[in-house]
């Protein structure tokens, strides 16, 4: 009878611990990693025809990935853009904003409504199947990265308040 109790206790403990959620890696690149280079082509004639991340070495870069269907990433992108442009036009940070909307028209309407003024705002119409999405191992939550002048990630998922503090 004692063995049955011990077996029951062991089974109970093992079943309880199996329901505890383990820490999962958060995916994407991390602070200290070198940002993966990419090229993105814009469909708008008003913007640069191609943006190449490696050409921005020597500048600090705020790299923001978002989509209009993801309210949190959209709001974060707009607040980062506003924080960047309201602090000082001569700051040393350039923003590269990449949307994963599958339709150019939705992207353009979102940019207009959110009043994003960055000339380096691009859309990747392949969405989650794009090379950039895969290179950066992005998930549904999207993310942003602050890169130093050598392309090394110095902050991940930075808020507008943190960006403003950095710029001041």
Where are these regions (language model features)?
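Hydrophobic beta-strand anchors of alpha/beta hydrolase catalytic cores
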Residues: 62-63, 95, 144
């Amino acid at each position: 009878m004692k063995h049955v109790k011990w077996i029951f206790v062991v089974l109970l403990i093992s079943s309880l611990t199996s329901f505890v959620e383990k820490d999962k890696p958060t995916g994407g690149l991390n602070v200290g990693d070198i940002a993966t280079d990419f090229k993105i082509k814009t469909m708008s004639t008003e913007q640069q025809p191609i943006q190449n991340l490696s050409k921005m070495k020597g500048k600090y870069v705020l790299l923001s990935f978002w989509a209009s269907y993801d309210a949190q990433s959209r709001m974060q992108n707009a607040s980062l853009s506003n924080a960047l442009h309201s602090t000082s036009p001569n700051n040393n940070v350039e923003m590269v904003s990449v949307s994963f909307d599958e339709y150019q028209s939705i992207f353009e309407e979102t940019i207009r409504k959110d009043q994003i003024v960055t000339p380096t705002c691009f859309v990747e119409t392949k969405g989650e199947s794009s090379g950039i999405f895969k290179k950066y191992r992005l998930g549904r939550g999207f993310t942003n990265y602050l890169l130093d002048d050598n392309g090394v990630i110095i902050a991940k998922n930075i808020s507008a308040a943190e960006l403003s503090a950095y710029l001041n």
